[in-house]
Amino acid sequence: TDGHQAAAPQVGDPQAGEAKANGVCLACHGPQGNSLVPIWPKLAGQHPEYIVKQLMDFKQRRANEQMTPMAMPLTDQEVLDLAAYYATQPKTPGAADPELASKGESLYRWGNPETGVPACSGCHGPAGGAGQSLAKFPRLSAQHADYTKQTLEHFRGALRANDPNGMMRGAAARLSDQEIAAVSQYLQGLSQ
């Protein structure tokens, strides 16, 4: 060999993550990562890569009144452990307003060519349940509509800017308030 060894993959321990989650994250993100408060995200079933990205962003550069102080003291291993734990937890689906969800489904699947809104499904998967783990695009199914709405509004107003190459800011800038409400309801009602 040439004397170089490949770096060992960084892997989280779900059991250690559960202990940390129950001590630090439970109050806001709920049992098993299913937040009971609609403005706080559900973490259950999320890609571990996405959770790691978000926690590291909070630790390094993303200012957030609630999350930055919670993430700062976490070690890199604790971040991996939390991500591994939440990724294995089942999501609790929500109910959606049927009329809004129908409009949101169309926008999610096909976008709005008239205003240049891209289809959400292009990055987040055909039913919101897949996302793309390697690209760190999140799973969106069963997420609280209030949280999704707030997130899209923050991207639209450039209050949130941790999206690669401004992808979400660009897409959200083209969304109307009605479209944000509709796609948020659609995603909340998905159970995958």
From Swiss-Prot:
GO biological process: electron transport chain; heme transport
Keyword annotations from UniProtKB, A to Z: Electron transport, Heme, Iron, Metal-binding, Periplasm, Repeat, Transport
Chief place of localization: periplasm
Domain Cytochrome c, first and last residues per copy: 12-90, 99-191
InterPro entries, A to Z: Cyt_c-like_dom, Cyt_c-like_dom_sf, Cyt_C_IC, Cytochrome_c4-like, Cytochrome_c_Oxidase_Subunit
Gene Ontology molecular function, alphabetical: electron transfer activity; heme binding; iron ion binding
PROSITE patterns listed in its UniProt record: CYTC
Coiled-coil features, chain-numbered ranges: none
Claim: RNA-binding is one of the keywords in the record: no
Pfam families for this protein: Cytochrom_C
Gene3D superfamilies, per database record: Cytochrome c-like domain (1.10.760.10)
Compartments (UniProt record): Periplasm
Sites where the protein binds heme c 1: C25, C28, H29
Residues engaged in binding heme c 2: C120, C123, H124
PTM comment text: Binds 2 heme c groups covalently per subunit.
A GO CC term assigned to this protein in UniProt: periplasmic space
Hydrolase found in the keyword field: no
Role: Diheme, high potential cytochrome c believed to be an intermediate electron donor in an anaerobic electron transport chain.
Protein name per the record: Cytochrome c4
Organism whose genome encodes this protein: Thiocapsa roseopersicina
